[in-house]
């Protein structure tokens, strides 16, 4: 309100009088402003709920519990991990195997035997490279310029598709340490070769780098690459690398068994790993449902309405904080969207799942609802019972959680698909009321109400300005009349004195 200089003749504090008169006039505006604030708080509270729901949605989108293969996860133990370790894919059968390692796979090495120094120049090198275990050669081209030193050449060899790790150092030749260039193949296994594809390349490799080549211009290996030789359950086999897969089990061999004897590996369902994933999901679900139940039961303090600016000025910051905490409480109490969502999620968990001609009930797997009323919908796990089910029937656990498709009948859908759909529909229901950060206010119900109230507030402020101006006009007229009366009285007094 603008301060106006009035009441000079009457001596009255007209600003104060008008201010008090306007307090009554402004009461409806304060009600509208409070209503607007309440709606804004409610909108924000709804959006906080959706943020929590989306946290679970994000978790589920990244979690592998939605995939049937998760429930077929395997764990593999080795009786001697200093010799070999192993992991199992879902295709690995639960079984035990005896493994003997006769030799490890090694990489071929190449050593120059006549390196006397490098002469810089322009060289276009071409090689035919056969990887261990392959029969088809791959062509590799390397361009060397006159600006390249021997270190640059070695760097280019290493970064090319030649498949070697090259270096230059002093190496013992039997009598002394001699500066030498050497290659080590990046791939283990027998049968690989590096061939100079033309005479210029052959001359470079022998003349500049000092390597020996055979009649076919292939580099002569210092040590040939070898295959790993293993025996699994009596079956002898050779492998190109020390990491290989047999019957769904991937072995990583580190040493031979000559000194230690055979190693036993055991493949079994990864009960602990599967259980921990289910428990983590249940914990995340419980966090959400507990939060939603808290909103549904939150106390509503009807005597605590949003504060006006005048009320805030009369209170300390702490008093305002405590007041608004109660004013915001209970804004979503018994909300239909939230209660529908929580009720449906309980139904999703406890309605039996039909799959493979069988029916599956959550309680059969050791997962039940808490008996505490205040924790309605909160899930509890009987660890022993669930682990036993995972061990004896992992496919049944997979069916319970992942059965069906998005187009399946409700009874044929697993729990993860049901919960996914319920979370999605709950978010949409809440967004219809409170929108989201990307939606315009006219796209959701609270936003429409806020727009309407904002229009009412603007109109009412215009009316109040008109009323205030009218009050000032009346008091100004009264003050002018008093001033005239005072002037007339003064004139009469002067006449009487004469």
Swiss-Prot record:
Record's keyword annotation contains Secreted: yes
Keyword annotations from UniProtKB, A to Z: Bacterial flagellum, Coiled coil, Secreted
Signal peptide interval: none
Any one Pfam family match given in the protein's UniProt record, by short name: FliD_N
Coiled-coil annotated residue ranges, if any: 448-471
Secreted as UniProt keyword: yes
GO terms of biological process kind: bacterial-type flagellum-dependent cell motility; cell adhesion
InterPro entries for the chain: Flagellin_hook_IN_motif (IPR010810), FliD (IPR040026), FliD_C (IPR010809), FliD_N (IPR003481)
Recorded superkingdom: Bacteria
Locations listed in the record: Secreted; Bacterial flagellum
GO CC aspect terms: bacterial-type flagellum filament cap; bacterial-type flagellum hook; extracellular region
Complex and partners: Homopentamer.
Family: Belongs to the FliD family.
PANTHER family on file: FLAGELLAR CAP/ASSEMBLY PROTEIN FLID, FLAGELLAR HOOK-ASSOCIATED PROTEIN 2
Function: Required for the morphogenesis and for the elongation of the flagellar filament by facilitating polymerization of the flagellin monomers at the tip of growing filament. Forms a capping structure, which prevents flagellin subunits (transported through the central channel of the flagellum) from leaking out without polymerization at the distal end.
The protein's name in its UniProt record: Flagellar hook-associated protein 2
Lineage: Bacteria, Bacillati, Bacillota, Bacilli, Bacillales
Encoding gene, per UniProt annotation: fliD
């Amino acid at each position: 309100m603008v301060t106006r200089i009035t009441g000079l003749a009457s001596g009255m504090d007209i600003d104060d009088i008008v201010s008090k008169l306007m307090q009554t006039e402004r009461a409806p505006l304060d009600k509208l402003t409070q209503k607007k604030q309440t709606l804004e708080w409610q909108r924000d509270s709804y959006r906080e709920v959706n943020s929590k729901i989306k946290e679970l949605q994000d978790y589920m989108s990244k979690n592998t519990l939605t995939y049937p293969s998760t429930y077929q996860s395997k764990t593999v133990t080795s009786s001697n991990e200093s010799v070999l370790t192993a992991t199992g894919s879902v295709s690995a059968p639960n079984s035990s195997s005896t493994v003997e390692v006769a030799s490890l796979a090694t990489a071929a090495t190449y050593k120059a035997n006549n390196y006397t120094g490098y002469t810089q120049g322009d060289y276009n090198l071409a090689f035919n490279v056969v990887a261990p275990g392959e029969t088809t050669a791959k062509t590799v081209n390397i361009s060397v310029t006159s600006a390249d030193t021997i270190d640059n050449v070695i760097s280019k060899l290493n970064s090319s598709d030649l498949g070697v790790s090259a270096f230059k150092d002093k190496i013992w030749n039997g009598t002394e340490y001699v500066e030498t260039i050497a290659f080590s193949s990046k791939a283990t296994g027998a049968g690989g070769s590096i061939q100079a594809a033309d005479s210029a390349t052959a001359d470079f490799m022998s003349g500049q780098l000092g390597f020996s080549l055979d009649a076919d211009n292939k580099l002569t290996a210092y040590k040939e690459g070898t295959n790993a030789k293993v025996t699994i359950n009596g079956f002898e086999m050779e492998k190109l690398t020390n990491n290989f897969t047999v019957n769904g089990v991937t072995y990583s061999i580190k040493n031979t068994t000559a000194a230690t004897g055979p190693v036993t590996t055991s493949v079994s369902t990864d009960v602990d790993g599967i259980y921990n994933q289910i428990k983590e999901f249940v914990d995340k679900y419980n966090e959400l449902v507990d939060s939603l139940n808290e909103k549904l039961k939150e106390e509503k303090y009807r005597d605590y309405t949003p504060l006006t600016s005048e009320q805030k000025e009369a209170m300390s910051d702490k008093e305002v904080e405590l007041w608004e905490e109660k004013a915001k409480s209970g804004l979503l109490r018994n909300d239909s969207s939230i209660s529908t969502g929580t009720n449906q999620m309980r139904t999703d968990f406890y309605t039996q799942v039909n799959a493979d001609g069988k029916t599956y009930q959550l309680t059969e797997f050791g997962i039940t609802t808490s008996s505490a009323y205040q924790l309605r919908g909160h899930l509890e796990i009987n660890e022993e019972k669930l682990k036993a089910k995972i061990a004896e029937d992992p496919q049944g656990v997979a069916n319970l959680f992942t059965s069906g498709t998005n187009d399946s009948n409700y009874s044929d859908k697993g729990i993860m698909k049901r919960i996914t759909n319920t979370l999605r529909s709950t978010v949409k229901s809440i967004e219809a009321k409170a929108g989201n950060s990307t939606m315009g206010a006219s796209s959701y119900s609270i936003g429409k109400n806020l727009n309407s109230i904002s229009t009412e507030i603007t109109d009412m402020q215009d009316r109040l300005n008109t009323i205030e101006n009218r009050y000032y006009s009346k008091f100004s007229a009264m003050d002018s009349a008093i001033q005239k009366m005072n002037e007339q009285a003064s004139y009469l007094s002067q006449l009487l004195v004469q």
